[in-house]
A protein has these predicted regions:
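Accessory DNA-binding and partner-docking regions appended to nucleic-acid-acting proteins
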Residues: 1-3, 337-338, 349-353, 363-365, ...
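Helicase motor core with emphasis on the C-terminal RecA-like subdomain
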Residues: 1-10, 14-18, 22-44, 51-54, ...
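Helix-turn-helix/winged-helix DNA-binding modules
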Residues: 15, 163, 291, 377, ...
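Short helix-to-turn junction characteristic of helix-turn-helix DNA-binding domains
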Residues: 27, 222, 273, 375, ...
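Hydrophobic alpha-helical transmembrane segments of integral membrane proteins
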Residues: 46-47, 59-60
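Short, charged low-complexity linear segments at domain edges
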Residues: 359-389
Length: 606
């Protein structure tokens, strides 16, 4: 079969998504390739499909045990022989996999980078024809990447040990230009076919909220999404426990996941979410990156992550099946303190040198600064993300929380002059910059001991804004940060003037900010456009999928995604020929599951 026939036969798609065919053709022509595609953009097909067509075996290097398991289960569900090699396997299981590798029973083998240098794996590989090495999450090989893993450097040594250099295929969803160049250099990609399909996920709605009480806001969001499946990310284990308890007390089918739980409980909770027994997963970032669940309708961040790379990767768990999905971040200033704590205490990897730790810490603070700016910006959120990753974009996307709000301009030149002048005079008086609280206290004319001891009551801007509340002054400072007049140096939490501030202080330039004409609570829900009858049929098909999933020991989305069930609902096939035309079905799955689904479809047609 040719590539298009294989795409239909095994994966159920009649055509390639953007970028896929170019990468597949490159691999089949013996070229190295580098695919930069968003989460849910179909990266796995780019190496799985040519892996079926190449004469030898494809090795896929992946950093995540749970992702390997899910990917191999999905391969088997599609009728493709695959296996994985990682630390989750017992010695007898590992020995059985090695034996089957030598017998040529697998076309695609997932392997953890740590296993590439193990004697048993190397002995098996020496006797195999390796046609391709695919590197998933390729940004992990670069120290400039947000998930740098020294174990990924072993990939290069492993490839050199092979008797013949295979095709090298690298893939990532989140990488700046600097990281991309580093990946190509380290992996020694030779004149690669490089495809950047863009980082945009048009089906995702982005929104940042600044609630006074996060619990109440979270409950309101979930109340509007009762029928939907989603993830609530928290920054700490303690927050996970508290939020999960809150949701279960309110009757939500919620479960939890964090590194503090026993592995058995983590797996039970993960499977309950994957099998749709629980609809809400409350988790730290230990969950999600390796989960291939396609029918996640929303991702809510209860706390701000420490980088846009992390945020976009976690938010990208939503809408993988192409359906509309919501990505909502609940921001509070204390989230910055939590992120700083993780940065200061996060570089405990024993494989890193002290110099590497310092480089990573500096980069982490730069990323945190970008993340905070995203949370505060009033410009297009999608545009902000795309610009960060170096992609051009329209000024307004029309599909995010910022674009849905109506703003008007307000002149705050007088207030800006007071604040900027105060920051400058404190620096001149003390010889160094101070934090935001000290600036606010000075402007309010505080008589606190520290203010007096520093002599800040003697500068001309002391008490200049004494009629304003501390919160009002803080909000103005935030607006000046948004406008680029001030910047918070996050490592030491000092408020500093930028070059742009000089125009206001010395040249009489005015300052205008955008304010909401009317504060409104946005509530974007996924409008699937289904009629009442279609919704009823869709639910029956979901029940059929759940029954088959339990019977076959696989997650429901591995049988068919929500997008496939939706297409099935709308096309309403009543015979096998029509059933195979449903997007995402394919020959193999039609032969295994077709009769069961057609029974439901025919029953609904009566």
């Amino acid at each position: 079969m040719d590539k298009t026939a294989l795409l239909q036969h095994y994966f159920g798609y009649g055509e390639f998504r953007p970028g896929q065919e170019e990468l597949v053709d490159g691999i089949l022509a013996g070229r190295d390739v580098f695919g930069i595609m968003p989460t849910g953009g179909g990266k796995s097909i780019c190496y799985q499909l040519p892996g079926l067509m190449l004469p030898g075996v494809t090795l896929v290097v992946s950093p995540l045990i749970s992702l390997m398991h899910d990917q191999v289960m999905a391969l088997k569900a599609a009728g493709i022989p695959g296996a994985y090699v990682n630390s989750s396997l017992t010695f007898p299981q590992l020995r059985a996999v090695y034996r089957n590798m030598l017998l040529g029973k697998y076309k695609i083998i997932y392997v953890a980078p740590e296993r590439l240098q193990s004697d048993g794996f190397l002995e098996a590989v020496e006797q195999m024809n390796i046609s391709m090495v695919a590197v998933d999450e390729a940004h992990c090989i670069s120290q400039w990447g947000q998930d740098f893993r020294p174990s990924y450097l072993k990939i290069v040594d492993f490839i050199r040990l092979l008797p013949r250099r295979p095709v090298i295929a690298a893939f990532t969803a989140t990488a700046t230009q600097k990281v991309r160049e580093d990946v190509k250099r380290i992996l020694d990609l030779r004149s690669p076919v490089e495809v950047v399909t863009g980082f945009d996920r048009p089906n995702l709605w982005f929104e940042v909220r600044h609630p006074e009480l996060k619990d109440g806001e979270l409950l309101r969001l979930l109340e509007a999404r009762k029928r939907r499946s989603g993830i609530v990310y928290c920054a700490t284990r303690k927050s996970v426990e508290q939020v999960c308890q809150l949701l279960t007390d309110r009757g939500y089918a919620a479960t939890r996941y964090h590194a503090g739980l026993e592995e058995r409980e983590r797996m039970e909770n993960q499977n309950a979410f994957l099998y749709d027994e629980k609809t809400v997963m409350v988790a730290t970032n230990a969950f999600g990156m390796g989960i291939d669940k396609s029918n996640v309708n929303f991702v809510i961040h209860y706390n701000m992550p420490k980088s846009l790379e992390a945020y976009y990767q976690e938010a990208g768990r939503a809408g993988r099946d192409g359906s509309n999905a919501d990505c909502i971040l609940l921001y509070a200033p204390r989230d910055v303190q939590t992120a700083r704590f993780f940065i200061e205490n996060g570089s405990d990897n024993e494989d890193l040198t002290e110099e590497q730790r310092e480089v990573i810490k500096k980069q982490d603070y730069e990323r945190l600064e970008a993340m905070v700016t995203y949370c505060k910006t009033r410009t297009c959120l999608r545009g902000w993300i795309l610009e960060y990753f170096g992609q051009k974009h329209p000024e307004v996307c029309g599909n995010c929380g910022s674009c849905a709000k109506e703003y008007e301009k307000k002149d705050i030149t007088k207030e800006a002059q007071m604040i900027l002048s105060c920051v400058r005079r404190i620096r001149d008086h003390l010889g160094y910059y101070v934090g935001k609280p000290t600036v606010v206290r000075t402007l309010q004319g505080s008589r606190e001991k520290k203010t007096i001891e520093l002599g800040l009551n003697e500068i001309s801007t002391y008490g200049l804004m004494k009629t304003m509340s501390a919160n009002a002054i803080k909000e103005l400072i935030s607006r000046l940060e948004d406008g680029g007049y001030l910047v918070t140096e996050l490592e030491h939490q000092t408020l500093r003037l930028t070059e742009k501030a000089s125009g206001v202080l010395y040249l009489g330039e005015s300052v205008e900010v955008l304010v909401l004409k009317q504060e409104e609570k946005l509530q974007r829900l996924d409008d699937d456009g289904m009629t009442e009858d279609e919704r009823e049929l869709f639910d029956l098909l979901r029940e059929c999928r759940s029954r088959l999933a339990r019977a076959n020991g696989v997650a429901p989305f591995m049988i068919f995604s929500n997008a496939t069930l939706m297409d099935m609902t709308r096309k309403h096939p009543t015979n096998m020929t029509a059933f195979k035309r449903v997007s995402g079905v394919g020959e193999m799955k039609a032969s295994w599951y077709g009769k069961d689904f057609l029974r439901v479809l025919k029953g609904a047609a009566k």
